[in-house]
Each structure stands twice: as structure tokens, then as C-alpha cells.
């Protein structure tokens, strides 16, 4: 069994939960959502996909992104009237109310704060998935799953992935919030680090995880680079009405870290448009849009907007990847949609 997930904090926590409950997982594949959307990922029968768009060859699928909602009913074999196959046009309609959010042998989907929350519900919903039945290994895994340590990890994952953070969380990150900032899915050479995190988040309390030398060093670097990152953001950002426009194309050695720092610098604006180079495809530009987490007055459905441009996401945050030659056209169109 192989786990296919995304290298962000939510994806790593999904990995911790799935490997806790599925001892048959023997390999991992970390990919970005766009590669899955573009059909560039070979998925095979038996694969578990978590926190990524759907692929019809998988066995279990766990997700919570609104733009992926139509494919839950396809995964269950309940097809919409508008046709077969994967959704090719923007469609953020949620599954019918009577459609179950958890199905044994299929996985789970709902618009939850995190994909990890959906995975957790799959393995803890009474009668749906696992009962020990005298099996000591399964009982130990269930005990861990129901522990206060794991419940706290899930609560923190919800908070991080849904951006339910305070200014103090952003300006003085600690604990799992700080650890989440050390994960950069655009660096495949970091895969051993992601694997280490999966194991520690599954097996160890927060204090032990923070005490690991590698994690400790990465966390300290995030804190040390915060001022450098702030200066770069201020130099590369323009305030255009209600929109924070940050253009990081051409910036070398951008510090890792705090994606929410921008909102502490421009608290009056309600949405951001960030443009950057796609580090994995040289002919591609990365575009992301997100509500200001401290000023959520925008009315834009960001996920639906990004889907129009070949991407996806949630109601309040999303991204897309576009060819460089077409980037300015997409940027103009997106800006016009989000400005007030």
C-alpha cells in the first residue's frame, strides 16, 4: 500500500494518521496538487490519496477542498447527471446532503478545516472503520488515536490549515504552528525530513518532536529569518485598493517560513494576490490568492476563481499554475475579480 499526499503540515499529519492505522503502508509519494490535476502522477490500485485531488485509480481518498467536492460522488459510484469522468469545468457544488462523508473502503470527504480531520473521522467513526476485535496492535493504534495528544495535534492542524490563527501565533509562532512553517513541498530533497515528521507526529509528544535536533534547527531558522522575510515582503508588495499584491518573481533565496506574516503588515486589506516562480517547472508562474486572515470581509469564492485558471482550493484560499507566456493575462483577470 502506498500513501500519496502533499508535503504540507496537513499532508504530513494525514501521513501520521494513515500509517498509524494502516500497517500495510510501505511507500510514500509526495506531490503538489497541480501535478495530480494535470494527470502527471501515476496512481495505482491500492494507493491511499490524502489532501490531494482525486484520481480514479486510488482505493482510499481523503480530502476537504471545495473544488474537489464533485469527485467524492464519482469515487462512490454516484455520478451527477451532467456527465461522467472527472470535473473539467469549475464546479464547487458540494455532494448531496444524503451522501455519506465517510465510507468504509472508500475514504472520506467533507468541507472540514483539514484533510487530517477527515482521516481522523474515518478511523474513529463508530461502526464505520476499525474495531480491535481482540487484536492488540489495532487496539494500541486506536488508543493512540483517541489520546489527548492526538486530539491536540488534530485541533492544531485544523487551526493551521484553516488559518484560524491569532496575530500572536503569526508574530511569535510556537509548537506545531512553528513546525508547520518548516515544511516546504517545493523541495523534494526534504523528503527524509517529511518522513521523520510523520514518524514523530505519530509516535511522540510535542516536546520530544521540538527537541529533535533537525526540527529544532529548522524552527530556529524560521525565527531567525523572520525579519529578513519581512523586508523582502515590504519591498516586493504594493497595496492596490483592498488587494495586497506581492510579486516574488526573480527573488532568489527567499527565506522559508511564515506565509501569514504579510497580513500583519497590511491589516486593512482583505485579500492577497501573490505571484512567484514555480520552482518545479521553469516555464510556469505560480499564483495564489487568499483572504487576509485578520480581515475576512472579501466575498470572493477563491477556490472557484482559481479553478477557472486551472487550479483550485478552498472558499478563502487557492492557487493555480499558469504558463509564463500567459501569466500577465491571468494576473490581470484574477485581480479584476478580487478587487472591490
What label would you give each PLM region?
Residues 162-171, 176-259:
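Glycine-rich, Lys/Arg-enriched anion-binding loops that position phosphate/diphosphate groups
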Amino acid at each position: 500500500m502506498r500513501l500519496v499526499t502533499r508535503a504540507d503540515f496537513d499532508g504530513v499529519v494525514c501521513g501520521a494518521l494513515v500509517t498509524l492505522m494502516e500497517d500495510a503502508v510501505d511507500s510514500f509519494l509526495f506531490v503538489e496538487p497541480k501535478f495530480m490535476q494535470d494527470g502527471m502522477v501515476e496512481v495505482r490500485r491500492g494507493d491511499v490519496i490524502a489532501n490531494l485531488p482525486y484520481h480514479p485509480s486510488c482505493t482510499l481518498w481523503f480530502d476537504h477542498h471545495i473544488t474537489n467536492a464533485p469527485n467524492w460522488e464519482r469515487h462512490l459510484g454516484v455520478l451527477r447527471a451532467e456527465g461522467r469522468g472527472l470535473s473539467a469545468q469549475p464546479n464547487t457544488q458540494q455532494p448531496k446532503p444524503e451522501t455519506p462523508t465517510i465510507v468504509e473502503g472508500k475514504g472520506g470527504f467533507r468541507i472540514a478545516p483539514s484533510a487530517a480531520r477527515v482521516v481522523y473521522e474515518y478511523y474513529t467513526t463508530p461502526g464505520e472503520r476499525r474495531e480491535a476485535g481482540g487484536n492488540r496492535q489495532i487496539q494500541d493504534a486506536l488508543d493512540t488515536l483517541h489520546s489527548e495528544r492526538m486530539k491536540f495535534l488534530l485541533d492544531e492542524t485544523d487551526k493551521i490549515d484553516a488559518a484560524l490563527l491569532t496575530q500572536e501565533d503569526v508574530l511569535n509562532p510556537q509548537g506545531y504552528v512553528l513546525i508547520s512553517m518548516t515544511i516546504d513541498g517545493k523541495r523534494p530533497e526534504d523528503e527524509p525530513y517529511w518522513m521523520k515528521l510523520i514518524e514523530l507526529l505519530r509516535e511522540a509528544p510535542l516536546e520530544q518532536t521540538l527537541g529533535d535536533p533537525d526540527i529544532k534547527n529548522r524552527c530556529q531558522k524560521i525565527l531567525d529569518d523572520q525579519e529578513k522575510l519581512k523586508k523582502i515582503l515590504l519591498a516586493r508588495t504594493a497595496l492596490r485598493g483592498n488587494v495586497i499584491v506581492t510579486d516574488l518573481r526573480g527573488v532568489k533565496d527567499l527565506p522559508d517560513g511564515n506565509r501569514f506574516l504579510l497580513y500583519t503588515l497590511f491589516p486593512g486589506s482583505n485579500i492577497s494576490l501573490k505571484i512567484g516562480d514555480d520552482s518545479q517547472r521553469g516555464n510556469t508562474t505560480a499564483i495564489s490568492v487568499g483572504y487576509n486572515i485578520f480581515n475576512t470581509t472579501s466575498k470572493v469564492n477563491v477556490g472557484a476563481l482559481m479553478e477557472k485558471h486551472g487550479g483550485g482550493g478552498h472558499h478563502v484560499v487557492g492557487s493555480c499554475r499558469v504558463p509564463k507566456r500567459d501569466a500577465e493575462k491571468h494576473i490581470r483577470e484574477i485581480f479584476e475579480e478580487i478587487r472591490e
